[in-house]
């Protein structure tokens, strides 16, 4: 019997939370984004988007801002967090 992707994802997420790794990774990401000024930049971008398109709703603003915000994450932050995730996965997944 093989495990489907949704089940595997669910188990990984559950283990991340139970092991405390989710909180560690999340805190590292938040700290780095705050330190780099990313949060303020995204707030400014969102305000600007709201002023330009006054009739838009949350979903429309999110669809515009989210891709730009993701691009604004620095390479060093992206690599650091991805490295933490890879290390966590290597601990729990048998790749042989």
From Swiss-Prot:
Cellular localization per UniProt: Nucleus, Nucleoplasm; Cytoplasm, P-body
Domain of life: Eukaryota
Keyword terms, alphabetized: Activator, Chromatin regulator, Cytoplasm, Isopeptide bond, mRNA transport, Nucleus, Protein transport, Transcription, Transcription regulation, Translocation, Transport, Ubl conjugation
UniProt entry tagged with the keyword Transport: yes
Family: Belongs to the ENY2 family.
Complex and partners: Component of the 1.8 MDa SAGA (Spt-Ada-Gcn5 acetyltransferase) complex, which is composed of 19 subunits TRA1, SPT7, TAF5, NGG1/ADA3, SGF73, SPT20/ADA5, SPT8, TAF12, TAF6, HFI1/ADA1, UBP8, GCN5, ADA2, SPT3, SGF29, TAF10, TAF9, SGF11 and SUS1.
Major subcellular site: nucleus
Annotated crosslink Glycyl lysine isopeptide (Lys-Gly) (interchain with G-Cter in ubiquitin) location: 68
Triggers of expression: The gene for SUS1 bears 2 introns, and its expression is highly regulated by splicing, translation and decay. The presence of the introns thereby play a key role for SUS1 function in yeast.
Protein's UniProt name: SAGA complex subunit SUS1
Pfam families per UniProt: EnY2 (PF10163)
Role description: Involved in mRNA export coupled transcription activation by association with both the TREX-2 and the SAGA complexes. SAGA acts as a general cofactor required for essentially all RNA polymerase II transcription. At the promoters, SAGA is required for transcription pre-initiation complex (PIC) recruitment.
GO cellular component, one term: nucleus
GO BP terms: chromatin organization; mRNA export from nucleus; nuclear mRNA surveillance; poly(A)+ mRNA export from nucleus; positive regulation of transcription by RNA polymerase II; post-transcriptional tethering of RNA polymerase II gene DNA at nuclear periphery; protein transport; regulation of protein localization
PANTHER family: ENHANCER OF YELLOW 2 TRANSCRIPTION FACTOR
One example GO MF annotation: chromatin binding
